[in-house]
Amino acid sequence: MKHTLRYAPIAAALLLITSCASKKAITDGTQLPTQTSKTDKNAEKEAARQSLQFVQRIANNNVATENILTSGDFTLQLGSKEITVPAKLSMRKDECIRIQLLMPILRSELARIEFTPNYVLLLDRYHKEYIKASYSEVSFLANNGLSFYSLQALFWNQLIAPGAKTITDADMKKFVADGAAGSSRVPGTLKAGNITYKWSVDAATALIKGADITFKSAAHGTSSLTWTYNDFNTVGQKKFPTTQQFGFSTNYGGSNHAAQVTLQMASPKTSTNSDTKTEV
């Protein structure tokens, strides 16, 4: 409100000048279009300033700890089929994201999904099989420009800087946060080539409540990854979402494919008691 009042006299003066210029144009043809353009530029600068300020608030919510360990339930939905098993989530910043799927009651490991900066690992303990591949070899990740650091930002409830480990001050200026609507959610957007990133952010707390990544290509069709966050608990003096749901869909190859995963976690800890890489 203070910013609006600060610019009100300027806007009023420009309106008056523009009005006088219109009358003068009738008599001698003189026009002063620059006055309107100055008003527009002032409005654009103020909108950009408010957008950057809000993006900085989002970044200030980042959990500062290096490790997050938690247990809970993992639910996978493929079409009409749904399965829920106990699970563990272990994350070490810039090194590893690991989801372990456990056998009910016995809690022995059934499968493991692991992301590191260099590879993706899918380990099936039950059938004694595994797939280990680089990000360029996993078509959905490669086609959508998703790297380890993109996935890390999503799991850690943070903004994504495409192709970078962290978001710099210069990167923050590329985001557009539109708080003009005055609603409880502020939409944020970032475009990078064929990929559009969108976030839904709580206006009061600046916590990210949802993220949507869409990739459009003539060669690979349209793919999307949608992430929602709920049930925020305190982790390292910051808020971390203990319920995360992410769904991905693609029509790559002319066929529609979709899946949805829900992670429900309890009491996240910041312990370092976990290996950073799985030996296979």
Show the residue positions of the predicted features:
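N-terminal leader/targeting segments and the immediate start of mature chains
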Residues: 21-81
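Edge/loop elements at the starts and ends of beta-strands within beta-rich repeat scaffolds
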Residues: 60-68, 78-83, 90-92, 113, ...
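An acidic-aromatic
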Residues: 96-149
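C-terminal motif of bacterial Sec signal peptides marking the signal peptidase cleavage site
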Residues: 16-19
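Bacterial N-terminal signal peptides that target proteins for export
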Residues: 1-9
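C-terminal low-complexity, charged extensions that often adopt amphipathic alpha-helices
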Residues: 141-149, 153-173
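Gly/Pro-enriched, hydrophobic low-complexity segments
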Residues: 22, 26, 167-279
